[in-house]
Amino acid sequence: MSRSTKKAPFVHEGLLKKIEEMNASGDKKVVKTWSRSSTIYPQMIGHTIAVHDGRKHVPVYLSEDMVGHKLGEFVLTRTYRGHVADKTSKRK
């Protein structure tokens, strides 16, 4: 179920504040965040945000196509290592 149309998209206040300060000063630093549920705003385009995947921070460069999506959509939380083949069944 999607968010109510009466409400604005969610973005962590501290994250948005850091982005707006960097836009005002012209800096392009990597910002660490644990807020995977924050929506990407147009002000964030061109910045790199390190999103936490549960183990480490993964840097994500934000482009125009990502606006409206959540930060967590671009960082995987699970690692797929493949299925382990059974060695005894291969001998037959």
From Swiss-Prot:
GO terms for biological process: ribosomal small subunit assembly; translation. Keywords: Ribonucleoprotein, Ribosomal protein, RNA-binding, rRNA-binding. One of its GO terms (molecular function) is structural constituent of ribosome. Transmembrane segments: none annotated. Pfam families: Ribosomal_S19. Gene3D superfamilies: 30s Ribosomal Protein S19, Chain A. Signal peptide: none annotated. One of its GO terms (cellular component) is cytoplasm. InterPro entries: Ribosomal_uS19, Ribosomal_uS19_bac-type, Ribosomal_uS19_CS, Ribosomal_uS19_SF. Protein S19 forms a complex with S13 that binds strongly to the 16S ribosomal RNA. HAMAP family: Ribosomal_uS19. NCBIfam families: rpsS_bact (TIGR01050). Belongs to the universal ribosomal protein uS19 family. This is Small ribosomal subunit protein uS19. It comes from Clostridium botulinum (strain Eklund 17B / Type B).
